[in-house]
Amino acid sequence: MASVAENRPVVPAADRKILLVGASRGLGLGLAKSFAAHGWTVVATERRASGGEGLAAAAAAANGHIRTELVDINDPQAVQTLRTQLSGERFDVIFIVAGVSDKDPTRPVHEVALHEAIHVFVLNAYSPICFAEAFFDLLKPQGTLAIMTSRMGSLTLVSTAADGSWEVYRASKAALNMLTRCFHQRHQHEGRTILLMHPGWVKTDMGGNDAPVDLATSVEGLYTTLISWHGSGKQAFLDYQGNELPW
């Protein structure tokens, strides 16, 4: 595992706070539970209230470590409303997990309806960066911005793909990677850490039952990797095992 752990001051987990965006299910929900279990204060968002299930149930069982908020990151007004609500808070980590896959990833791009492709690109690439820009000043000076991406967005690794599937999803994640690098260029002198994180092929609604990585393994790997880079002030593209990935 790659690591940049140095002699940086260690802040007790109990004093750390994370804004976790897109935590209603799957990886986002798993991360909310993991950070809370490690003693963090978690502000976790979902598009719609989950009632007594999902994130709401996790919050109820977390002894005050998880607080829920509503936001649709595709809705600029909703993003601004949340930004106003949280304006007095400061976060050690902002982790944007929200994303979507193509309804049928076996289709090549020319068979995907325009409105479907636009939805994937907006939610996977455009909206995460717009959200990051709106909330970046709520990160503490040594804070970390993490965004969930995929190795499928790597231009280098595309040659290792077994087939041509997931074309729209791959392209949207490549766009996210590029926009995040541009974001880093704008903010590189501010000292914060910016991480793009690949969770592995995980058994979730998106990953399916054939995925080789279980949710707990991915989530704990993401947590450990993020903590090892937190406070470094660097930018990196990493997988859940801490390996640096090629762009």
Regions found by a protein language model. Name each.
Residues 21, 91-99, 124, 147, ...:
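Rossmann-fold scaffold of SDR-type NAD(P)-dependent oxidoreductases
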Residues 38-54:
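Conserved glycine-rich Rossmann-like NAD(P)H-binding loop of the short-chain dehydrogenase/reductase
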Residues 199-205:
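Short, flexible catalytic-loop segment of classical short-chain dehydrogenase/reductase
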Residues 73-89:
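Conserved Rossmann-fold cofactor-binding substructure of NAD(P)-dependent oxidoreductases
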Residues 100-121, 126-129, 144-188:
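Catalytic loop of short-chain dehydrogenase/reductase
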Residues 189, 196-197, 208-247:
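C-terminal helical subdomain
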